[in-house]
């Protein structure tokens, strides 16, 4: 039985502290859709998605209403498209292969709109060691696919602790990001494109969600939110030491995660689909008070980004994991604190104040998930510089055996200090300054940075 004060506490979390479930994501295998005929492949994919997800949104909304817990997004993640498209494009020339990939992307978008999900992830390639012909075709098609779709998200895994960093793929992704920015309005395509090291197979969050090869046919994964709830707890403890602070964060993370698992299991039961994982990531929104930066400031930092920010974030991340892991046995996805710039009003203010730089942001990614996220940079930034930013972030992931990622937006025509506004969950991004010195010769070397000693675990 729940005590009355627990019920009141939960209501307060939802009404006053922005507690919500960020996403309920249906993972779908498309491996049974494979065909040598492109039209048949597209038809199979469309039918599989629309039949499997036809009740997803309606079910999630009904359960959200039943428990009074807002579910912000309903999403789908599919098998990486590069793994299912090979047979249909193997006899085509390069230009036709790219066109075929885009057509599949358009089918994904059409299916996403049909079942009314907010986003569909899985326009993806796994090239952490090398790339196949279909991997390369899919990567080359990303800017054109983004130009023609609205809800499809793309991710490319270019590094892992076991294989090292595929620098040829890193170089290419810098160019792809630049081209995507050019081809989409306000570079919005780049907000739906992420480059990974050690990408998880069960991530419910966009833009990096895909349905991994080790997964079953269908699964429900959920992602929690709740920075406002954590901040409220810390603000009640202005003089507490760090041990007490960590303990209180653990307790509230336990409660947040318990809500996430409850909703996830209810949705999966209603849909007749297996329940997968709860992703413990604290995901901010542009709403006032729903901010990771504000949590760090509540700990005693004048502004997020000042000295001590990395330590504060490490404490937060660790305490959230410990509390969340107590609440559910099935933890997965990214499971940490997100520090996206545009999606976090406190981060935006820190950049505006000059407290948070790109370099400090990179340092903070060493102790949380997921990486350089929703960072807008000047549109004239060279592709080689973007590739170098990716390489740095991949190195952090590979050496520390953790997931890291880059979602960076070179906005055409914008300079440092200006803004790009996307509205909604993506928020408003200040254009951040990048290092003016060139990395081009370094990136041109190509090849693969070998796996670190940490890879030799057998």
Swiss-Prot record:
Matching Pfam families: DUF711
Classification via InterPro entries: UPF0210
Superkingdom classification of source: Archaea
Family the UniProt entry places it in: Belongs to the UPF0210 family.
PANTHER family: UPF0210 PROTEIN MJ1665, UPF0210 PROTEIN SPR0218
Protein name: UPF0210 protein MJ1665
Organism expressing this protein natively: Methanocaldococcus jannaschii (strain ATCC 43067 / DSM 2661 / JAL-1 / JCM 10045 / NBRC 100440) (Methanococcus jannaschii)
């Amino acid at each position: 039985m729940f005590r009355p004060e627990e019920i009141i506490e939960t209501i307060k979390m939802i009404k006053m502290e922005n507690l919500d479930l960020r996403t309920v994501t249906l993972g779908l295998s498309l491996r049974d859709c494979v065909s040598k005929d492109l039209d048949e492949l597209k038809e199979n994919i469309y039918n599989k998605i629309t039949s499997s997800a036809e009740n997803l949104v309606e079910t999630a909304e009904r359960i959200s209403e039943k428990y009074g817990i807002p579910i912000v997004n309903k999403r789908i993640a599919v098998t990486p498209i590069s793994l299912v498209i090979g047979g249909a494009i193997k006899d085509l020339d390069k230009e036709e292969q790219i066109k075929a990939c885009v057509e599949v992307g358009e089918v994904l978008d059409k299916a996403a709109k049909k079942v009314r999900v907010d986003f569909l992830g899985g326009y993806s390639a796994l090239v952490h060691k090398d790339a196949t012909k279909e991997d390369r075709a899919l990567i080359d098609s990303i800017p054109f696919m983004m130009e023609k779709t609205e809800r499809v998200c793309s991710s490319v895994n270019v590094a892992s602790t076991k294989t090292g960093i595929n620098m040829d793929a890193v170089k290419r992704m810098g160019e792809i990001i630049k081209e995507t920015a050019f081809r989409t309005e306000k570079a919005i395509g780049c907000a739906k494109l992420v480059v990974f090291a050690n990408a998880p197979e069960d991530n419910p969050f966009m833009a990096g969600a895909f349905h991994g090869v080790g997964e079953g046919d269908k699964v429900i994964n959920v992602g929690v939110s709740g920075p406002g709830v954590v901040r409220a707890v810390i603000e009640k403890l202005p003089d507490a030491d760090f041990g007490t602070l960590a303990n209180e964060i653990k307790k509230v993370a336990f409660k947040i995660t318990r809500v996430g698992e409850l909703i996830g299991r209810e949705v999966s039961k209603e849909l007749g689909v297996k329940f997968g994982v709860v992703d413990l990531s604290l995901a901010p929104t542009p709403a006032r008070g729903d901010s990771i930066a504000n949590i760090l400031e509540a700990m005693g930092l004048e502004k997020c980004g000042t000295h001590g920010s990395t330590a504060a974030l490490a404490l937060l991340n660790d305490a959230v994991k410990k509390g969340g892991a107590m609440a559910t046995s099935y933890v997965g996805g990214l499971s940490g604190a997100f520090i996206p710039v545009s999606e976090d009003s406190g981060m935006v203010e820190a950049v505006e104040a000059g407290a948070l730089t790109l370099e400090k942001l990179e340092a903070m990614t060493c102790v949380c998930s997921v990486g350089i996220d929703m960072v807008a940079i000047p549109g004239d930034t060279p592709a080689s510089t973007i590739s170098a930013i990716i390489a740095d972030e991949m190195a952090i992931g590979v050496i520390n055996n953790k997931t890291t990622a880059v979602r960076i937006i070179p906005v055409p025509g914008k300079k440092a200090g200006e803004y790009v506004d996307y509205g909604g969950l993506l928020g408003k991004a200040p254009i951040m300054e990048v290092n003016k010195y060139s990395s081009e010769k370094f990136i041109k070397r190509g090849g693969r940075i070998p796996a670190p000693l940490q890879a030799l675990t057998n």
